[in-house]
């Protein structure tokens, strides 16, 4: 008898409940076809949690997620809460759960199927063969740095601090190299090393780790160029690793 896996379900806001309901149908079908066993527990999160419990990430929801084997999250936020103070914004709960669960690696695959290739505004010959994955660092950088405002002579000044440590960079870069090793063995590290000190540290760390993976081809791409190349030649990318804001 297979072990029952606990899944914490937090549908969230907007289209979230609709999407999550369909995902649960798929999971239940896998139970029937492959013999898996899932136990679903539901919790409030995001805007709906603010409305009902006064916080975007209730303690009982966080405990439920910490006790689960996996978390199934729908969508967070909406215009209704856009003008809330920072601590009462749905996105604050999202950052909180990422930090609390140590969710440092965000894996974003992008595959273009031939049957859908005409649905894009890009030419089919540009898109054909696209199969890439973006590995985004998720718990560091500008999203988690110190934020504040202060009064100045000509009005307020707002500050968002971008901070990265070597261990934070190392763990996401190694994860990306491992993923590339299992795929087509190509890794593009995206940064802004011509301007940002955090990006220079990022690039130095990537270069130091690269010899551990001699079978993986590495290239460095500045983020603005990466955006252009994803439109011009998306099929040339295999694995992309980058920091929180760029991902």
Give the ranges of each region predicted by the language model.
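Conserved beta-strand segments of alpha/beta enzyme cores
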Residues: 37-39, 106, 217-219
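N-terminal beta-loop-helix "entrance" segment that forms/cooperates
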Residues: 33-59, 228-230
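Glycine-rich phosphate-binding loop
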Residues: 62-80, 215-247
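Extreme N-terminal starter segment of soluble prokaryotic enzymes
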Residues: 2-7
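N-terminal glycine-rich phosphate/adenylate-binding segment common to multiple enzyme folds
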Residues: 51-159, 245
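Glycine-rich phosphate/diphosphate-binding loop of Rossmann-like nucleotide-binding domains
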Residues: 8-25, 30-31, 154-224
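Short glycine/threonine-rich loop-to-helix capping motif typified by GTGT followed
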Residues: 53, 197-207, 231-237
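Buried hydrophobic positions in well-ordered alpha/beta secondary-structure cores of metabolic enzymes
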Residues: 13-16, 69, 135, 176, ...
């Amino acid at each position: 008898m297979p072990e029952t896996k606990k899944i914490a379900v937090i549908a969230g806001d907007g289209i979230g409940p609709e999407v999550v309901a369909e995902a649960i149908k798929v999971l239940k079908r896998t139970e029937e076809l492959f013999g898996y066993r899932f136990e679903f527990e539901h919790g409030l999160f995001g805007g709906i949690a603010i409305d009902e419990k006064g916080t975007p990430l209730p303690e009982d929801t966080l405990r439920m997620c910490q006790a689960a084997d996996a978390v199934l999250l729908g969508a967070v936020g909406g215009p209704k809460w856009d003008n809330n103070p920072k601590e009462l914004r749905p996105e604050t709960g999202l950052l909180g759960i990422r930090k609390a669960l140590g969710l440092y690696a965000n894996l974003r695959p992008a595959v273009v199927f031939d049957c859908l290739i005409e649905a894009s505004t890009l030419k089919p010959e540009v898109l054909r063969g696209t199969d890439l994955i973006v590995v985004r660092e998720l718990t560091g950088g500008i999203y988690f740095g110190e934020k504040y405002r202060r009064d100045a002579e000509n009005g307020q000044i707002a500050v968002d601090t971008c901070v990265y440590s070597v261990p934070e960079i190392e763990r996401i870069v190694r994860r990306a190299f491992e993923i590339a090793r299992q795929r087509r063995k190509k890794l593009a590290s995206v940064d802004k090393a011509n301007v940002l000190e955090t990006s220079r540290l990022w690039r130095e760390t990537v270069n130091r780790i690269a010899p551990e993976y001699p079978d993986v081809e590495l290239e460095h791409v500045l983020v603005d160029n990466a955006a252009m190349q994803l439109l011009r030649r998306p099929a040339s990318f295999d694995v992309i690793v980058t920091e929180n804001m760029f991902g």
